[in-house]
């Protein structure tokens, strides 16, 4: 087999991504244990089943989630929503997740399979109606429940649950499909009162990513006590500014889910919407979520660039976000970025067809568009359009240098207000087609 230079370069980037973005250690919240196993659902024998359990009994846990708005909601999405609605987010003590099969568009039998996964874990932890379920993989196939059931039992019966770094990294690996690296982030924060707490998050995703009021597959857990109503608002706010601001290919999955559990293992007052620390926690969770969401884009299927689309000075935040999303989802913009072509006309085109809530957010006579270098090289900003006027003397050599960077920024200044929004996206390469052309095989 003749290996092309392009293929060799792609392999090098995959290795670099793993070494760059996968941690070698972490700090993890009190009162949780996680376990994972290769149940046999994945043909390659990789980890494909994971369980997270809250072991803290000092106070009841709380949970929140944000789900896909795709009309073909998968069985695990519908089942988890039902659990959260019936419990009002209180007393959720476990998450069970599988990869390799999405259990989507599988009818009533798929619903029964999702419920069976929940029931198996509930029985093992001795707490009814206490588990959420998540699945990812190929759509339209039923779960191999003989393997899933045996795998869940093995995790519990063989004492495969732990709170060490390897256990957390492995459960992050267990939700991967076309991912080239597991997404695991952990961090310790300090509140205004000096109390410290820990947050850990995992996500999977490299393709079928353009969430809307939800996001791919991921979960956060913390040892901070947070009331369920406050937790839902914190997670929604954070998601709207992180996972709802990423795009790889413009496709929204049937299974997109982000959930968060707060077990209150840290001895401090419960965070409510009226707490002095509420806004601080909301900000900390949001910045944490951005870090994790950006890892998904950095692992975009076949991608070679990480691109920040920064829309400034809009009349409203919503319109800034709509414009940033329109640019990020444009196939023509993404392919131009891959080809290192400074085709600013495609950017303006994507801005022009954005479905704005307030048309006054866009004034074609005042808009400016630039490429921004992120490697501290000068000139850092290369103006393409200024006050609605194309810059006919654009330095093509400098444009090529910026577009050759692994990280770069597209800056749009609307000059119609004071609101801003960011989206994170990647380019679209030949490799993306190769990966998705034979995904089921």
From Swiss-Prot:
Involved in the stabilization of negative charge on the oxyanion by the formation of the oxyanion hole, annotated site positions: 136-137
Site keyed Cleavage: positions: 214-215
Domain of life of the source: Eukaryota
GO biological process: L-arginine biosynthetic process; ornithine biosynthetic process
Main location: mitochondrion
Record pathway: Amino-acid biosynthesis; L-arginine biosynthesis; L-ornithine and N-acetyl-L-glutamate from L-glutamate and N(2)-acetyl-L-ornithine (cyclic): step 1/1; Amino-acid biosynthesis; L-arginine biosynthesis; N(2)-acetyl-L-ornithine from L-glutamate: step 1/4
Keyword set includes Cell wall biogenesis/degradation: no
Record field: catalytic activity: N(2)-acetyl-L-ornithine + L-glutamate = N-acetyl-L-glutamate + L-ornithine; L-glutamate + acetyl-CoA = N-acetyl-L-glutamate + CoA + H(+)
Post-translational note: The alpha and beta chains are autoproteolytically processed from a single precursor protein within the mitochondrion.
The keyword Mitochondrion is assigned to this record: yes
E.C. numbers: 2.3.1.35, 2.3.1.1
Cited CDD domains: OAT
A GO term for molecular function: L-glutamate N-acetyltransferase activity
Active site residues of this protein: 215
Subcellular location(s) of the protein: Mitochondrion matrix
Record family assignment: Belongs to the ArgJ family.
Function comment: Catalyzes two activities which are involved in the cyclic version of arginine biosynthesis: the synthesis of acetylglutamate from glutamate and acetyl-CoA, and of ornithine by transacetylation between acetylornithine and glutamate.
Miscellaneous information on this protein: This protein may be expected to contain an N-terminal transit peptide but none has been predicted.
Record protein name field: Arginine biosynthesis bifunctional protein ArgJ, mitochondrial
Organism of provenance: Candida glabrata (strain ATCC 2001 / BCRC 20586 / JCM 3761 / NBRC 0622 / NRRL Y-65 / CBS 138) (Yeast)
């Amino acid at each position: 087999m003749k290996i092309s230079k392009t293929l060799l370069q792609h392999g090098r980037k995959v290795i670099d991504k793993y070494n760059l973005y996968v941690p070698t250690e972490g700090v993890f919240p009190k009162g949780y244990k996680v376990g994972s196993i290769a149940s046999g659902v994945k043909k390659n024998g990789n980890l494909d089943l994971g369980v997270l359990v809250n072991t803290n009994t000092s106070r009841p846990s709380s949970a929140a989630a944000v789900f896909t708005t795709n009309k073909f909601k998968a069985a695990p999405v519908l089942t988890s929503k039902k659990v959260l609605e019936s419990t009002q987010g209180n007393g959720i003590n476990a998450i069970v997740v599988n990869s390799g099969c999405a259990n989507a568009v599988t009818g009533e039998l798929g619903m029964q399979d999702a419920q069976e996964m929940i029931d198996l874990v509930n029985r093992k932890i001795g707490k009814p109606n206490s588990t959420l379920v998540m699945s990812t993989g190929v759509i339209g196939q039923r779960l191999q429940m003989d393997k899933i059931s045996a795998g869940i039992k093995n995790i519990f019966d063989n004492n495969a649950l732990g709170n060490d770094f390897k256990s957390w990294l492995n459960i992050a690996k267990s939700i991967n499909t076309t991912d080239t690296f597991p997404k695991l982030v952990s961090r310790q924060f300090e509140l205004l009162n000096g109390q410290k707490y820990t947050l850990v998050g995992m996500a999977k995703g490299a393709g079928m990513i353009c969430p809307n009021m939800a996001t791919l597959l991921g979960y956060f857990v913390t040892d901070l006590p947070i009331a369920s109503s406050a937790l839902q608002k914190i997670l929604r706010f954070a998601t709207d500014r992180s996972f709802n601001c990423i795009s790889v290919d413009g496709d929204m999955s049937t299974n997109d889910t982000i959930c968060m559990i707060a077990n209150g293992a840290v001895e401090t007052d419960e965070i409510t919407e009226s707490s002095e620390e509420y806004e601080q926690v909301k900000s900390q969770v949001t910045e944490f979520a951005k870090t994790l969401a950006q890892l998904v884009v950095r692992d975009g299927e076949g991608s070679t660039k990480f691109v920040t689309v920064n829309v400034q000075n809009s009349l409203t935040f919503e319109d800034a976000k709509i414009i940033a999303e329109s640019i990020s989802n444009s196939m023509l913009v993404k392919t131009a970025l891959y080809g290192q072509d400074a085709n600013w006309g495609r950017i303006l085109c994507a801005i022009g067809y954005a479905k704005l809530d307030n048309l006054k957010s866009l004034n074609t006579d005042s808009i400016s568009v630039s490429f921004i270098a992120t490697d501290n090289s000068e000139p850092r900003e290369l103006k393409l359009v200024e006050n609605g006027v194309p810059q006919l003397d654009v330095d093509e050599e400098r444009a090529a240098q910026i577009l050759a960077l692994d990280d770069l920024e597209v800056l749009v200044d609307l000059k119609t207000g004071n609101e801003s929004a960011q989206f994170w996206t990647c380019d679209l390469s030949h490799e993306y087609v190769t990966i998705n052309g034979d995904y089921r095989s």
